[in-house]
Structure formats: structure tokens, C-alpha cells
């Protein structure tokens, strides 16, 4: 925000996870980090919540950022002001290497020209498309569909994180509804009637008052998933080509930590003990035969 002058919508609004029974709550992996809400407290926090939810966990330390509408615009402007150049509409066709040392990439420009960009080091961070560029990265797309509905301002203050659906309230009353998990969809584009129906049922399951609010937008994306659903961060088999991919549903959440790790690897900066543990856990070699 300070570099771009654009408000990214970052705020600590808190997340509530509702449960139908207390046993499910006790099994929740981050139970110890949340505040228990009994039925009255849960309904005081979220007026209009579906009555089937009897218990809740409030994670007051968590929040949100408007990554789709604001964050990417802010990031692009901040990068441009610091000398970063973008080639929009270009497609990486091939990695250029010699004696297993990275030299650059060959790309197809938006105007159809085949050009080469030479550099000393590079980071492969191409999301669900990473495997198409570097075949050693075992990443496949898992499609997700989303929509937004328009509600009254301040109608919903907390994020509701249900077992199948989540609702994220923005400051202007818009509520983001996500997201389907379509493992067999590949790179098939577009929203589908079945996907929208699933999201609409999710709204009713969590927050019935919003089921008839007008739809504002529908969209979709492709999550980059590895076989163990954990990211790949570290050095590749090609010297000076680094990997930061496969974050699945946690790309925005892990973006700051990933960038710091990759920066340290590229600049040969010493890692602290926690960073060493992350690198060991997410190293690409775990998938090599």
C-alpha cells in the first residue's frame, strides 16, 4: 500500500468456524488458537446464521485482503514504480539451459514474435501452469468457481468458514462466496450451472438470509495442486532456477513468507531454523524418484 498508494482491503475482521456438534469442534486442527463460542455467542456474532450450527470457533487474529480487486492492482503499480517490466500476453515456450545451468527463457509475445530473455537467475512461480513450463514439477489444476452477492453494508462482519463453503464480507456489503473443488475439470474454463448451484446451496447452508441477494459476479480459477497438496519451494534440478509453486488454496496466505524464503535462497542469505524447516518440508526433491 505504501509503494502503490492503493488500499488493498487488508483488515483483521476475524474468522468464525461453525460446527453442528461439539465433537467436530474438538477435532478441528487449529482448535487451540480459537475462542470457543456457545450457541448464544455464535448467534450474537452472526445474526441470521443457519440454526443447524450449534457451536463455533472465533479466530480474532485472522482477517482478509481484497486480492482480486485491489491487491493485484497495487502490486502491479508498486512493481512498476520500482523498475519491474511486464510482458502481458506473453507465453513461456521453453527454458534455455546449458550443462544444466539456467540461461533464460524463450517466449512467444502477444504479437506472435518468438523472443528470448537471458538472465542469471529465475523463479518459476506460474501456478497451475508450472508443469507445462518445467515438467519436473508435479502440479495439476484443481478448478474452483466463485460468485459474489450484494448485501447491506455491515450486515456481516466476520468471515464464515464452513466445511464446504466460505463467505467473505467486504466493506461495501459485497460478500464473496467460495469455492467449488473440481479435481477432474482440468483447464476447462467458465462457470457451470452445477458449480453455481453448489455455491448457492452453500450460502443457504451457512447464511440463509443471503440466499436471495442479487448475484454481482461469477468467476473461476485454477488452483495449483501437488500430490501432497503442499507447496514446492526451493532449488530445482537446473542450477539458478528456483521454484515457488503448488500452493493450492494458500497462495495469497503464503505469498509473503514464500517471497522471503525465495529471496534468501537466491541471495544466498542464511536461513533461520524455522525457515530451514520450511525448506526441508517443501523441497522439490520429495517428488523425485
Give, region by region, the residue ranges found by the protein language model.
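A short coil-to-beta-strand element that immediately follows conserved catalytic motifs
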Residues: 10-12, 86-87, 140-144, 208-220, ...
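A short, glycine/Asx- and small/polar-enriched loop/turn
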Residues: 48-54, 96-104, 225-229, 236-239
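Helical element adjacent to the flavin cofactor pocket in flavoenzyme catalytic cores
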Residues: 58-121, 125
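Central helical "cap/lid" subdomain
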Residues: 108-161, 189-193, 209, 273
Amino acid at each position: 500500500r505504501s509503494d502503490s498508494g492503493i488500499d488493498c482491503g487488508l483488515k483483521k475482521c476475524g474468522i468464525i468456524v461453525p460446527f453442528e456438534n461439539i465433537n467436530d469442534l474438538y477435532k478441528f486442527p487449529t482448535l487451540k488458537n480459537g475462542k470457543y463460542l456457545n450457541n448464544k455467542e455464535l448467534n450474537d456474532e452472526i445474526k441470521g446464521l443457519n440454526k443447524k450450527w450449534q457451536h463455533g470457533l472465533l479466530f480474532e487474529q485472522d482477517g482478509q485482503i481484497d486480492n482480486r480487486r485491489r491487491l493485484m492492482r497495487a502490486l502491479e503499480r508498486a512493481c512498476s514504480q520500482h523498475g519491474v517490466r511486464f510482458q502481458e500476453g506473453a507465453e513461456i515456450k521453453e527454458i534455455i539451459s546449458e550443462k544444466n545451468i539456467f540461461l533464460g527463457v524463450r517466449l512467444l509475445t502477444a504479437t506472435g514474435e518468438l523472443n528470448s530473455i537471458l538472465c542469471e537467475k529465475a523463479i518459476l512461480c506460474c501456478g497451475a501452469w508450472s508443469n507445462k513450463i518445467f515438467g519436473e514439477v508435479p502440479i495439476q489444476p484443481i478448478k474452483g468457481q466463485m460468485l459474489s452477492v450484494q448485501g447491506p453494508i455491515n450486515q456481516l462482519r466476520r468471515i464464515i468458514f464452513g466445511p464446504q463453503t466460505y463467505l467473505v464480507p467486504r466493506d461495501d456489503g459485497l460478500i464473496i462466496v467460495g469455492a467449488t473443488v473440481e479435481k477432474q475439470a482440468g483447464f476447462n474454463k467458465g462457470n457451470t450451472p452445477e458449480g453455481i448451484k453448489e455455491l448457492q446451496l452453500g450460502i443457504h447452508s451457512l447464511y440463509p438470509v443471503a440466499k436471495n441477494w442479487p448475484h454481482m459476479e461469477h468467476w473461476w480459477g485454477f488452483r495449483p495442486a501437488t500430490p501432497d497438496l503442499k507447496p514446492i519451494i526451493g532449488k530445482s534440478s537446473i542450477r539458478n532456477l528456483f521454484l515457488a509453486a503448488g500452493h493450492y488454496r494458500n497462495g495469497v496466505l503464503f505469498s509473503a513468507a514464500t517471497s522471503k524464503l525465495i529471496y534468501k535462497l537466491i541471495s544466498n542469505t542464511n536461513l533461520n531454523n524455522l525457515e530451514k524447516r520450511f525448506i526441508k518440508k517443501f523441497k522439490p526433491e520429495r517428488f523425485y524418484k
